[in-house]
């Protein structure tokens, strides 16, 4: 492949990543809205923000649906960061 072809391919891939990043952000914001609603329900019902069993179930489910190429450890790490970050919206 020539440098020009590689450059075009690189540009296309970067453009695709930009689009995916926008989609991810949209989905994360949708998830955040759900988290806020859950937080309001938990406050009303005087429940704890952190529910370790629910988090474990969520992460276990992600392990079963992960088809790669990310390893389960990578996916779990990313989702743990998302969970921990969005928990603040429930407070």
Question: Where are the regions a protein language model picked out?
Answer:
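Domain-level signature for soluble enzymes in the chorismate/prephenate branch of the shikimate pathway
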Residues: 1-91
């Amino acid at each position: 492949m020539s440098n020009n072809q590689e450059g075009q391919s690189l540009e296309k891939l970067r453009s695709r990543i930009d689009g995916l990043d926008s989609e991810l952000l949209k989905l994360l914001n949708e998830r955040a809205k759900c988290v806020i609603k859950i937080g309001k329900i938990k406050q009303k019902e005087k429940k704890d923000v952190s529910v370790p069993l629910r988090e474990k179930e969520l992460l276990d489910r992600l392990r079963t649906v992960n088809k790669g190429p990310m390893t389960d450890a990578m996916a779990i790490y990313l989702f743990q960061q998302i969970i921990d970050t969005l928990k603040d919206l429930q407070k």
